[in-house]
Amino acid sequence: MRVNDRNAAMHTRTTAFGFGCKIHVMKTLLVRHATVLATMDALGTEIPDGGLFARDGVIEMVGPTADLPDTADTVLDLRGHVVSPGLVNTHHHLYQSLTRAVPGAQNADLFNWLRTLYPIWGRLTPGAVAVSTQVGLMELARSGCTTASDHLYLFPNGSRLDDQIVAAREVGVRLHASRGSMSLGRSKGGLPPDDSGCRGSMFTFQRD
């Protein structure tokens, strides 16, 4: 987890860190006095009054606060918090974060939900892809997720996978971006309208 905002980290009841990963551009970081540090190892080891020490963005030490260095360039006192390795989200569609509250899609089954939202998703723009990526990744980061695999399969109006990747770099969560495509619109037996960008996704895939 990149610690971009100390205050945000201090007010999050559960703080997650990716073991062995870059977490911020700084010289040293000391996390100490966490109520519990959950290692998530094979034995389920939990360390009371735990913490970690990182140098140049790489975690070097994990253990009881008493066993860690006394100071660092940045020090986080996490009393009342739980520290754990970062969570991994293995399946996401980040662009859908923009359409959660569409009335016609509430309480619908999957196919009717898709039929309702495909026309809206067909109006996605490069900017909308970027914003939805950042909204979704920031929400994941605040809930302890440090890695996400996203499946983007609609590319209308000039949208590209690159738009998502560039936007994700500003957040700091690891992103495994994957590109899908659809070749069948509604007239051919598929779910999305023919003009929703599904055919465009095939053209983009073939072009690249």
Write out the residue ranges for each language-model feature.
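Alpha-helical scaffold segments that flank or form the walls of functional sites
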Residues: 22, 100-151, 156-173, 208
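Metal-coordinating catalytic core of metallo-dependent amide/deamination hydrolases
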Residues: 159-208
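Hydrophobic faces of well-ordered beta-strands that scaffold small-molecule active sites
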Residues: 88-90, 148-150, 175-179
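Aromatic (phenylalanine/tyrosine) cluster motif
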Residues: 17-19
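N-terminal metal-binding scaffold of metallo-dependent hydrolase/deaminase domains
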Residues: 22-70, 82
